[in-house]
UniProtKB/Swiss-Prot annotation:
The keyword Lipoprotein does not apply. This is Ribosome maturation factor RimP. GO terms for cellular component: cytosol. Gene3D superfamilies: Ribosome maturation factor RimP, C-terminal domain, RimP-like superfamily, N-terminal. It comes from Yersinia enterocolitica serotype O:8 / biotype 1B (strain NCTC 13174 / 8081). SUPFAM superfamilies: YhbC-like, C-terminal domain, YhbC-like, N-terminal domain. The gene is rimP.
Length: 152
């Protein structure tokens, strides 16, 4: 997924303290608005607890206070990826080959911005998704948002 310059900088700043605590930084989202939000997704092989989120929040807050990359007031949220796991990198798509995903594109393809299908292949920065029996290829940089579709 094509990250903004701010999101790239935040990822660089945040990854070290998250990994130092023994967690994987799955990705981040910075949502601008009346009350902006910095959402950080973390994971580990043992799962994520509320205490883990609190520890990461505390460490990341300290680093962000020093680095100060965000010029507006914001809320910090730390959570596990959950069932509708967000996808941020080519590695995420590779890890979930064969799974169903929902994509929201930055720029429409075939007059559509929202797509849903099965992740078929990953080739560098290109993702192939089978939608209604037809393979569609998406540039990672054109994917605004992507989430796994949970099945129960």
């Amino acid at each position: 997924m094509g990250l903004s310059t701010l999101e790239q900088k935040l990822t660089e700043i945040i990854s070290a303290p998250v990994e130092a605590l023994g967690y994987e930084l799955v990705g981040i989202e910075f949502i601008r608005g009346r009350q902006s939000t910095l959402r950080i997704y973390i994971d580990s092989d043992d799962g994520i607890t509320v205490d883990a989120c609190a520890d990461v929040s505390h460490q990341v807050s300290a680093v962000l206070d020093v680095e100060d990359p965000i010029t507006v007031a914001y809320n910090l949220e730390v959570s596990s990826p959950g069932l509708e796991r967000p996808m941020f990198t080519a590695e995420h798509y590779t890890r979930y080959l064969g799974e169903e995903v929902t994509l929201v594109l930055r720029m429409a393809m075939q007059n559509r911005r929202k797509w849903q299908g099965i992740i078929k292949a990953v080739d560098g920065e290109m993702i192939t998704v089978t939608v209604d029996g037809k393979d569609e290829v998406f540039a990672l940089s054109n994917i605004q948002k992507a989430n796994l579709v949970p099945h129960f």
